[in-house]
Amino acid sequence: MIFNCKVKKVEASDSHIYKVFIKPDKCFDFKAGQYVIVYLNGKNLPFSIANCPTCNELLELHVGGSVKESAIEAISHFINAFIYQKEFTIDAPHGDAWLRDESQSPLLLIAGGTGLSYINSILSCCISKQLSQPIYLYWGVNNCNLLYADQQLKTLAAQYRNINYIPVVENLNTDWQGKIGNVIDAVIEDFSDLSDFDIYVCGPFGMSRTAKDILISQKKANIGKMYSDAFSYT
């Protein structure tokens, strides 16, 4: 469905990630893990909805974390739309990699960069629905300065006994005490058998496809219990 939107709030972080809160002209239902398509200067740009479906008056999008022209252009577009209160168009909701909240299986959530927005929606929904099974969240970034939601996730892990948060930094450039390297390698190191897990993945396209291939071949992951919109493309 097509909606006209306005930007109601923009939150910047030290890591150059922007949380953009947009308000559609009509509320619509979506599932945790779905995304919107923003029409921007003749381009169709997908953004995961970062908030829980129970909070649908404003949609939270995470923008940035990349020097790619599309990311810079999107940030500029949203900031200008906020300053001048210009309307823009989205198409929503989209995506089949939504949370299967009826499942009792443990959850493995894997995010790369701003792929955390997708994972954040799923995690927030798990908390809202009081799901009690173990939840493991692995978040991989290039350097620790890009962990823009690190404290928020640490707080949730401390508050809920079933949530385990594991940040992974690929390039060490400071006094980092956590895991170092590729986020998929970190998962491989920590698990021997993923056959019972529901696995949700979001990040760069190559990372998502690599996660699928490696976790199935090396860790017995069940393809029927793995979810990522990247899996829809060959």
Swiss-Prot record:
EC number of the protein: 1.-.-.-
Superkingdom, taxonomy of origin: Bacteria
Enzyme class: oxidoreductase
Binding site for pyridine: G112, G113, T114, G115, L116
UniProt entry tagged with the keyword Oxidoreductase: yes
GO biological process: bioluminescence
Keywords: FAD, Flavoprotein, Luminescence, Oxidoreductase
Signal sequence bounds: none
Molecular functions per Gene Ontology: oxidoreductase activity
Entry annotated with the keyword Flavoprotein: yes
InterPro entries in the cross-refs: FNR_nucleotide-bd, MRET, OxRdtase_FAD/NAD-bd, Riboflavin_synthase-like_b-brl
Function: Probable flavin reductase in the luminescent systems of different marine bacteria.
Similarity field: Belongs to the Fre/LuxG FAD/NAD(P) flavoprotein oxidoreductase family.
Name of the protein in its database record: Probable flavin reductase
